[in-house]
Amino acid sequence: MGVANDSSPEYQWMSPHRLSDTVILGDCLYFNNIMSQLDLHQNWAPSVRLLNYFKNFNRETLLKIEENDYINSSFFQQKDKRFYPINDDFYHISTGGYGIVFKIDNYVVKFVFEATKLYSPMETTAEFTVPKFLYNNLKGDEKKLIVCALAMGLNYKLTFLHTLYKRVLNMLLLLIQTMDGQELSLRYSSKVFLKAFNERKDSIKFVKLLSHFYPAVINSNINVINYFNRMFHFFEHEKRTNYEYERGNIIIFPLALYSADKVDTELAIKLGFKSLVQYIKFIFLQMALLYIKIYELPRCDNFLHADLKPDNILLFDSNEPIIIHLKDKKFVFNERIKSALNDFDFSQVAGIINKKIKNNFKVEHNWYYDFHFFVHTLLKTYPEIEKDIEFSTALEEFIMCTKTDCDKYRLKVSILHPISFLEKFIMRDIFSDWINGRN
């Protein structure tokens, strides 16, 4: 029997580097460099000592801090023009149902808590193994349309993230109570806290207070103030009431320019497109070509991403033309950016079986499931599409569904259109800007 490599489906079961009960997939140098900047064992004094610490402050002492000239601009929200990452810290950029994401330097670091009772560590590697497998098997420029993780660490102890979150939450609670002259308490109402935090988070006075208290109380190079309300919703969600935030995976990605959903008309034109709709055609066409090329691979006509939507498509610089051949046509992309599919956590391909997707789907699906969902989310994200009658009418061919066979944009029934449906679709004049290098 031959040795499996990362071009084979069996790659997901290999354990190239073992550290105790943990495993590293990919480049150890990248992984160890990032890990060397994390303190996974940091802990803090009991919360009661934090409460006693804040008893030393009142509205008058906080006012003196607010009058100070010092301000750490990294404590503004990242969407604020005043935000600036003045330290080489981990900056929280997103928290979703399946991961907490940080940015550091030119990398993105994603922490994923895994329900170890449901899956073994090696059964949670799809986000690394599927894109790597596809990248190594695709032969043309279409491989550039995939985001591959640089490294992935399995079965790491991640309790520090939840502990850090609780420490920051307690700090914010006590700080806001002190600002309002209230009795100090670590009890809170989610609704009341979020309202108070959201009212203050953009205030320069509040940021000055954070500039003082975050280093003193938290003393960590992990900054979770940005989008803290998303982290709050994650950890405080009722479905995680009894969740054990014990172990999970750490995944390192290259840093993108934007996610596709962040592009508006102004940015689309800045990126070189004639209009926002032309930009949308661009990302649709590149994703369609990627799928078609994947389905051409042996045993890969079962590929599913299972979450194809604009915010799972990332934009990167493109320094040379991307040329993809399909039958007698040649699709040429001279744009300064490229789109790349990301977040393969629920994906499957060839012999790489993903138990997460297997448990979620009751009927058989193929590429059409993904594009049905993709078109729904495109139309929701970009109502401007309706202004282009030809394009919007064509897209409706993907969503001829009813409430009985579609729930929250996802197909509940099995519709297995052949990939030739998608091939014929992208040959239309809608995409003439890119066919045979016309652009």
From Swiss-Prot:
Catalytic activity: L-seryl-[protein] + ATP = O-phospho-L-seryl-[protein] + ADP + H(+); L-threonyl-[protein] + ATP = O-phospho-L-threonyl-[protein] + ADP + H(+)
Main location: host cell
InterPro entries to which the protein is assigned, alphabetical: Poxvirus_ser/thr_kinase, Prot_kinase_dom, Ser/Thr_kinase_AS
Entry function: Essential serine-protein kinase involved in the early stage of virion morphogenesis.
A molecular function (GO) term: ATP binding
Annotated Protein kinase domain residues: 87-439
EC number(s) from the headed UniProt entry: 2.7.11.1
Assigned GO CC terms: host cell endoplasmic reticulum; host cell endoplasmic reticulum-Golgi intermediate compartment
Native source species: Variola virus (isolate Human/India/Ind3/1967) (VARV)
Subcellular location: Host endoplasmic reticulum; Host endoplasmic reticulum-Golgi intermediate compartment
Family according to the record: Belongs to the protein kinase superfamily. Ser/Thr protein kinase family. Poxviruses subfamily.
Keywords of the record: ATP-binding, Host endoplasmic reticulum, Kinase, Late protein, Nucleotide-binding, Phosphoprotein, Serine/threonine-protein kinase, Transferase
Post-translational note: Phosphorylated in vivo. Autophosphorylated in vitro.
Signal peptide: none
Active site: D307 (proton acceptor)
Protein residues bound to ATP: I93, S94, T95, G96, G97, Y98, G99, I100, V101, K117
The protein's name in its UniProt record: Serine/threonine-protein kinase 2
